[in-house]
UniProtKB/Swiss-Prot annotation:
Cysteines paired by S-S bonds: 72-78, 172-188, 327-354
Residue ranges crossing the lipid bilayer per the database entry: none
Top-rank taxon: Eukaryota
Signal peptide: 1-20
Designated name of the protein: L-asparaginase-like protein GA18140
Family: Belongs to the Ntn-hydrolase family.
Length: 457
């Protein structure tokens, strides 16, 4: 009887844990075993090349991710931007960037803004092996590459001009300038800064990510002994301002790996990725005990709270080979996974649907949302600072926005308006701005009192 009670007690203690382990994660645990090779986007040939190296045996993770990058930079199988010299900066310059990280000791090597050297990942590897630095940039990076034995090449001018000339004829749209004169949305420059008082906070312009037109690719390899390496390669954003460094070269932005917990690959708007270091955040979320699925989603939601129009994706892998992904702004985010199951090599293209960015930002469904004006008096005489009216129409994947002024706060507030002086003051303030549009759309009208929400973005 005593042993029966112990068994019953043990079952009661373990049952919740067993249920938790058996619950279905947001992204199903893959039926693929180690070793594991993951690469961003639907570039199966490059993934296959990397996998061929990885499955030769343990401790081949570094060579595997390098081989994947080499395949992309030496062929057109990873889209014409990476292999075809068709991602020039605004002056027509062709530069590359690449990075490599070792999850065992956190060694890191990267190059950025490097012109005339095709083998960017090889130079990044040399930075890791032969220097105490982490990142070399520009002409000095090219000189370092030549000293390491890499040959300088002349890029195809005709290919570059085929891309650059239509852009120049189209008044250099799109570009990456703001708060300058002449207006960046109608000119090629030369630009000069606007005075500070004339600066406007505009919604960040995001450029659509089209299939086969990616300017960055990432690879992550995990072997049977738990060794991790990650690598990235990028041609840089098209028509970028010369001198710009992208996320592919910045630790934690495009790639990160730590043998103790796992690794991550991020891709998309590099200037946003560099501000949040999502690959690093995801790995640290794993360290804190989150699953790859929850880590990926949490990081993506964090990006969206600050940059609602972000386009891109994130893949997170645990040290045990469980992986998941999250994305925003795309119809679908694809990545390629190769591994072994029952002694046989398996490869598949994973595709996930992206987060509904509007639910992240507004916490609500599709429809019409309004944000109302200025500083108005709440009941009790408190000042509440809000944004001027912004209408956001959220239909089936179509966004239309009307902006009047800059963001103010990143939280919601409600205001009770009572009859009397405060109500009249609120009413007059609303009349002075587009706030009457809000009242009309919400079906609210005088006489007061009324109650309505303020939705922040």
């Amino acid at each position: 009887m005593r042993y029966l009670c112990r068994a019953q007690l043990l079952s009661l203690l373990l049952l919740p844990l067993l249920k938790a382990r058996l619950s279905v994660p947001a992204h199903p645990i893959p039926k693929i075993f180690l070793p594991l090779m993951i690469s961003t986007w639907n570039y199966t040939d490059a993934n296959r090349e990397a996998w061929t190296v990885l499955r030769q045996g343990p401790r081949r993770t570094r060579q595997a991710v390098i081989q994947g990058c080499l395949h992309c930079q030496n062929s057109n199988s990873c889209g014409r931007l990476l292999g075809g010299h068709s991602a020039p900066d605004s002056s027509g310059g062709i530069t590359l960037e690449a990075a490599l990280i070792d999850g065992a000791n956190m060694d890191y090597g990267a190059v950025a803004g490097m012109a005339g050297i095709r083998n960017a990942i090889g130079v990044a590897h040399d930075v890791l092996r032969y220097t105490n630095h982490s990142l070399l940039v520009g002409e000095a990076a090219a000189r370092f590459a030549e000293a390491m034995g890499h040959k300088k090449e002349v890029h195809s001018l005709s290919t570059t001009l085929d891309v650059l000339l239509p852009w120049l004829l189209g008044k250099c749209q799109p570009n990456f300038w703001r708060n300058v004169r002449p207006l960046a949305n109608d000119s090629c420059g030369t630009f000069s800064p606007l005075p500070q008082e004339q600066h406007q906070r505009e919604m960040r312009q995001e450029y659509p990510i089209e299939p086969g037109h990616h300017d960055q690719v990432g690879f992550l390899a995990l072997d049977t002994e738990g060794h991790l390496h990650a690598a990235s390669l990028s041609s840089g954003a098209r028509f970028r301002i010369p001198g710009r460094v992208g996320d592919a070269a910045v630790p934690g932005a495009g790639i990160y790996a730590d043998n103790q917990v796992g690794g991550a690959l991020a891709t998309g708007d590099g200037d946003v990725l560099m501000r949040f270091l999502p690959a690093l955040l995801a790995v640290e979320a794993l360290r804190a005990g989150q699953s790859p699925a929850s880590a990926a989603e949490a990081v993506m939601r964090r990006l969206l709270r600050h940059h609602t129009e972000f386009n891109g994706g994130l893949v997170v892998v645990s040290r045990g080979g469980v992986y998941s992904a999250a994305c925003a702004g795309l119809d679908e985010f694809q990545f390629v996974v190769s591994g072994e199951s029952s002694g046989r090599s398996m490869r598949r293209v994973e595709g996930i649907k992206c987060l509904d960015r509007h639910e992240v930002v507004t916490g609500g469904p599709r429809g019409n949302f309004y944000v109302v004006p200025k500083k108005i008096w709440a009941a009790g005489g408190e000042d509440v600072l809000v944004q001027r009216v912004e209408k956001i129409t959220l239909n089936e994947g179509v966004d239309s926005r009307e902006f009047e002024e800059e963001y103010v706060e990143d939280k919601a507030a409600e205001i009770d308006v009572d009859e009397g002086e405060k109500a009249e003051e609120v009413r007059s303030l609303l009349d002075e701005s587009p706030g009457d549009l809000l009242l009309h759309q919400l079906g609210l009208a005088p006489p007061f009192p009324f109650r309505f929400p303020f939705i922040y973005f």
